[in-house]
Amino acid sequence: MAGTRFSLLRAALFAAALSCPGAALAVDPPYQAQMERLAGAMGSLYFLQPLCGHSEIDWRAEMADLIALDEPEADREARLAGAFNAGYEAYARFYRSCTESAREAMRRLLIQGEEAARDIHSRYAE
């Protein structure tokens, strides 16, 4: 299930990156907010999944791949990395062990990531 969602995330971001010929401009693309939400969700999952014994996806490596696909300028890249780190830190402050709440958060984060990817794909890649 997570693999299918990630494939959708990757496809959406790849398509969005290809559809923005003006990416060299210092103006944020219209999907920047969704990208930052997606980055935050991935950072949170990077913390929570190993905590709960689910480490089949290396979210940090996947985030690096998505940034590479998007080819952002330095400022945008820093904001995406910052959103990823903020997502990680938000859950690291409150969770020391896997709880039912942590498992529910993972479930919601996967849904949020999937929704962000679908939104990016449907609005900007077609």
Language-model regions, residue ranges each:
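Bacterial N-terminal signal peptides that target proteins for export
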Residues: 1-12
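Localized chelating/binding microdomains
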Residues: 12-18
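N-terminal secretory signal peptides
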Residues: 26-66, 119-126
